[in-house]
Design a protein with these regions (language model features):
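Extracytoplasmic/periplasmic, Sec-exported soluble proteins
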Residues: 76, 80-84, 155-162
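Short, well-structured beta-strand
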Residues: 48-69, 105-173
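Generic detector of N-terminal low-structure segments
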Residues: 13-15, 78, 142
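Short acidic/polar alpha-helix capping motifs at helix-coil junctions
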Residues: 12, 66-71, 97-102
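Bacterial Sec-dependent N-terminal signal peptides
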Residues: 1-21
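Secretory pathway targeting signatures of secreted, lumenal, and periplasmic proteins
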Residues: 31-80
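Signature of long, low-cysteine stretches enriched in small and polar/charged residues
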Residues: 20-25, 29-35, 41-46, 85-137
Length: 173
């Protein structure tokens, strides 16, 4: 029994320290399971990495007319900021779910000063044909949508653990 505990503890210790922390947006940090590839395509910033069990990615998308919104936001009350964020996040999550054709578990969250949504659903993995878990945290950050998503490649407990570790590693300044 002690050997099993030692192995589990060692594995957990190693997996925690093999994480790669990145600042994905001004003041928002996340720990990727491996060093992610960074790219910018059509103004969308993306970080992506894959393990044997999961694909982890982050996308940062500017709000249309972002500069005008940032000027107007200076005069918004906290209630008005929340109202704008909620409206934008509601529309964003509805579009994502409509394009996937799935129903999801959606719950409001707040990370630091940023409003967001936690989204969880199942979908068919096109590579394997297996139904696997997908989970996202979408934050409204300075007139940007920051989508932090993890797609499990299989239904193993290790895949679910990697997904949860990734999504729970989000920190803000």
């Amino acid at each position: 029994m002690k050997n099993i505990l030692l192995i589990i503890t060692s594995f957990t210790f190693l997996s925690l320290f093999s994480q790669v922390r990145k600042e994905i947006e001004n003041g928002i940090w996340i720990a990727f399971p491996k060093n992610p590839q960074y790219s910018v395509t059509q103004g969308i910033q993306q970080y992506i990495t894959q393990t044997d069990n999961a694909v982890c990615m982050v996308q940062s998308i500017d709000l249309p007319q972002r500069s005008q919104y940032l000027i107007a936001e200076r005069n918004f009350s906290e209630a008005e900021k929340k109202e704008v964020a909620d409206s934008f996040l509601k529309n964003y999550t509805q579009r994502v779910m409509a394009s996937s054709g799935n129903t999801a578990r959606i719950s409001p969250i707040k990370k630091g000063a940023h409003y967001g949504r936690r989204i969880g659903y199942s979908a068919i993995n096109p590579a394997t044909g297996e139904i696997t878990q997908r989970s996202s945290i979408v934050l409204f950050v300075h007139a940007k949508v920051v989508s932090i998503e993890c797609i499990t490649i299989n239904n193993s407990s290790q895949a679910i653990a990697e997904m949860n570790l990734f999504l729970n590693s989000i920190t803000t300044k």
